[in-house]
Amino acid sequence: MPKHSHQFVEDYDGLVAFGLGREEDENTLTYYLQKFSDDEHMALIRGRMSEEDLETLFNLLGRLMKQYLTGDEYHKVFLKDEG
């Protein structure tokens, strides 16, 4: 069984828009991030991104996880550590 899932983007049929309210913003962000991280999309875009953009995106994601996840959450939810 796969450890990772992107089911939200498959099931979501709500509004995809930003700035209309917290719930719509959260749903839109989840939708966009799951679409962005799709294997086919990533294979296409990562080769076109500058070294600076790769580093900027990597650092942004790391900073957000460090800010909003505990160490245990990072290991359990993001890394999917079993132990």
Named regions from a protein language model:
Residues 11, 28-32, 44, 60, ...:
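Charge-rich, solvent-exposed alpha-helical interaction surfaces
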Residues 2-40:
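N-terminal acidic leader/helix
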Residues 42-58:
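Acidic, low-complexity, intrinsically disordered interaction modules
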Residues 54-83:
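Short, compact, well-ordered microdomains
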Residues 39-42, 75:
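A general structural signal for well-ordered secondary-structure junctions
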